[in-house]
Design a protein with these regions (language model features):
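An N-terminal domain-cap segment
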Residues: 1-59
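Catalytic micro-motifs at enzyme active sites that drive phosphoryl/nucleotidyl and oxygen chemistry
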Residues: 9, 30-34, 74-80, 116-121
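Coil-to-beta-strand transition motifs
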Residues: 29, 40-44, 84-86, 203, ...
């Protein structure tokens, strides 16, 4: 395999999504500071407790309302087009019963200690906790759009490097342009005339964005085999660079 599955890409996007909105017919899209995939195949989301969306869901009761959660995965560097991918989750949005809120907050906080959780069901409550029962999931990026079954989504895991990816890409862009240039040497000649930027990094390879007068082009450089730790990642990048020193003290650190 030379690239993550769509389900893996969605799980990684869920883990690092820099922006998420939830939309319901007749109401302006609402920011959701918490959007957490639960093991039962639903999403826990928070919405402003004093907003129209919270009131609409409360009025609907057990029936809930049809809603779409949109998560945006932004590049961690200043690209001309910063959005790397979008994920849309459609389903029924319902309130979480008061008796279940505390337990669910603890469950979310165990893996995602989001500060917004402290503002749910508290003395200074700003957000209401809701559950989105998934009916469909679609992801889109520069290669196209694809739907994913909920079972596949639950079976997948985020990329092991997704929590560190932003810092690494920023480091490559600001301090190691020589590494980016070496990677760019693997691109077709026509693409090398554009400005090459680091776009993504995962266990399967490196993605580059080429910004040119003719538009943007995303190119993936796969590793020879997937890697699972920082040592393997560093070695795989050196192989892509064509570095002759793959081991020992003379190996370049990236």
């Amino acid at each position: 395999m030379t690239a993550p599955t769509t389900a893996e890409r969605i799980r990684s996007a869920c883990a690092r999504a820099g922006g998420a909105m939830i939309a319901v017919d007749g109401i302006d899209p609402t920011t959701t500071p918490v959007h957490h995939l639960l093991c039962d195949g639903s999403f826990a989301v928070t919405v402003p407790s004093a907003g129209r969306l919270a009131a609409s869901v409360a009025t609907a009761g057990a029936a809930g309302v049809q809603a779409v959660l949109e998560m945006t995965d932004y590049a961690p560097i200043a690209l001309r087009e910063p959005v790397r991918s979008l994920v849309w989750v459609q389903g029924r949005l319902r309130e979480v019963a008061d008796r279940d809120v505390s337990e669910l907050l603890d469950l979310i906080a165990a893996s995602d200690p989001n500060p917004a959780l402290l503002q749910v069901h508290s003395d200074e409550s700003r957000y209401a906790l809701m559950r989105l029962e998934i009916e469909s999931v679609v992801a889109a990026d520069s290669t196209g759009a694809e739907s994913v079954a909920v079972g596949d989504l639950l079976a997948a895991r985020p990329d092991p490097f997704c929590a560190m990816e932003s810092c690494w890409l920023q480091h490559l862009e600001s301090d190691h342009r020589d590494v980016v240039d070496r990677l760019a040497n693997r691109l077709p000649g026509a693409l090398r005339r554009g400005r090459v930027r680091p776009l993504g990094l995962d266990r399967y390879g490196v993605a580059l964005r080429v910004e040119s007068d003719g538009g943007d082009h995303d190119v993936r450089l796969p590793f020879a085999a997937p890697v699972d730790d920082v040592t393997g990642l560093s070695r795989a990048i050196r192989v892509l660079m064509g570095c002759p020193f793959l081991n020992g003290l003379r190996a370049r650190r990236v």
